[in-house]
Amino acid sequence: MSKKSNKKLHIICLAAFAVLLCAAIWLLGRVCQPKYMSGVLEGAMTQEYYNEENPHDVIFVGDCEVYENFSPVTMWEEHGITSYIRGSAQQLIWQSYYLLEEVFERESPKVVVYNVQSMKYDTPQSEAYNRMTLDGMPLSKHKLDAIKASMTEDEDMVSYLIPFLRYHSRWSELTDEDFEYAFRRDPVTIAGYLMRADVEPMTKLPTAPVLDDYTIGDTCWEYLDKMQKLCDANGATLVLIKSPSLWPHWYDPVSYTHLTLPTSDLV
């Protein structure tokens, strides 16, 4: 065999090995990545949206205060409004923005509803919550931008793109669920609404804490402005809400001057 043939065979073998290695890493990542099919279901919510086939009149974005407080089924049955909730646990405003960018690539909702609670956070907060929102997004510029904006100091971009690098330590903890749902997921929501059967009445209103700073951070204002411009560019009306909740505390209207968010902007 000539040297030229040997070199060609060597290149083919290296290419085949690289392909097999990449396939193995991808497969192991699918197996080791958390499935969120039991226990904490919130991590499975983001990717459900991509199975939607019909457009929606209204899109909700935000944290648990949207996916636990609004029912798309009720909105349809009582008002004939089609809607979907693109919510996730502790969804930060920049994550809401990039999820909304995805929405406008797929459909043209008339109204976007954003719950402002997460504007209390002006910096990345938690890798665990980041993962529950971002891991379900398909690879795209929107996902890359969302990861970059969301990473805490101890995180890196590569581990989001190659899940096995982050989740390989789960190998000894794998259960039947990890293999059963390696390539599929069961729905955990109804149009993004996470139905709960363990709701309890309020028995005590928490004491409102005294905050060191009542202002909303510049990053939050920046992304709220970008969200408004994105909606305007796509012919959608942006509605800001704050859902009723025990926490964070509802401060008296006279205190809103400290929050720097005009009461006229709240629904």
For each feature predicted by the language model, list its residue ranges.
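N-terminal Lys/Arg-rich, disordered targeting/topogenic segments
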Residues: M1-K8
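Hydrophobic membrane-insertion alpha-helices, especially the h-region
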Residues: I12-R30
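Alpha-helical transmembrane signal-anchor/signal-peptide segments
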Residues: Q33-Q47
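Catalytic nucleophile-elbow at a beta strand-turn-alpha helix junction centered on a G-D-S/GDSL motif
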Residues: P55-N69
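Membrane-embedded segments
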Residues: E65-L144
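Secreted/periplasmic serine-hydrolase-like ester/acetyl group-modifying domain
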Residues: Y129-N234
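Active-site segments of SGNH/GDSL-like serine hydrolases
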Residues: Q228-D252
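Conserved small/polar residues in nucleotide/adenosyl-binding loops
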Residues: T257-T263
